[in-house]
Regions:
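A conserved beta-strand-loop-helix scaffold within acyl/acetyltransferase catalytic domains
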Residues: 2-141
Length: 142
């Protein structure tokens, strides 16, 4: 969406650096209500991952190298802009430098048998959680 750009001589960039779309999900509902609003294939894939033993873990800076390997693979696979690892290191640093600002940055990694499959940066504030960056491996996609 390019709201108000015609009068300001602004143009959309050739590629998106941050998410181009936003979905608002009400997390005050119970799990079954949230799942029922999803497409059947999405529900199936979530339940399949649970049955197969995929675990999602919140990690700190120690997970950054794993994140970056998945992120690099994702960016190369999809032709996305690739930030340097220092960009993501600074995201964590800003969280720790300002612990009272009400914002929390979490790095979540999904593992199967200690093998990292996917990862995401989740930014939490008082009333919102934003899935900011995601990454996944090309292997074990079933």
């Amino acid at each position: 969406m390019n709201y108000g750009t015609c009068n300001r001589n602004l143009r959309k960039a050739n590629s998106n650096i941050l998410p181009a779309n936003t979905i608002v999900l009400d997390l005050t509902q119970d799990e079954s209500a949230i799942l029922n609003r999803m497409k059947p294939k999405t529900r199936y894939n979530i339940r399949l991952a649970l049955r197969k033993g995929v675990n999602v873990v919140s990690v700190g800076m120690e997970g950054l190298e794993t994140w970056y390997e998945l992120y690099t693979e994702t960016a190369l696979r999809n032709g996305l802009h690739l930030n340097d690892i220092s960009y993501f290191r600074n995201m964590f640093a800003s969280k720790t430098e300002c612990p009272d600002n009400g914002v929390n940055v979490k790095l979540m990694i999904a593992y199967y048998d200690k093998i990292p499959l996917a990862a995401m940066f989740l930014v939490l504030s008082a009333h919102r959680a934003t899935y900011l960056y995601g990454a996944s491996t090309s292997k074990m996609r079933n």
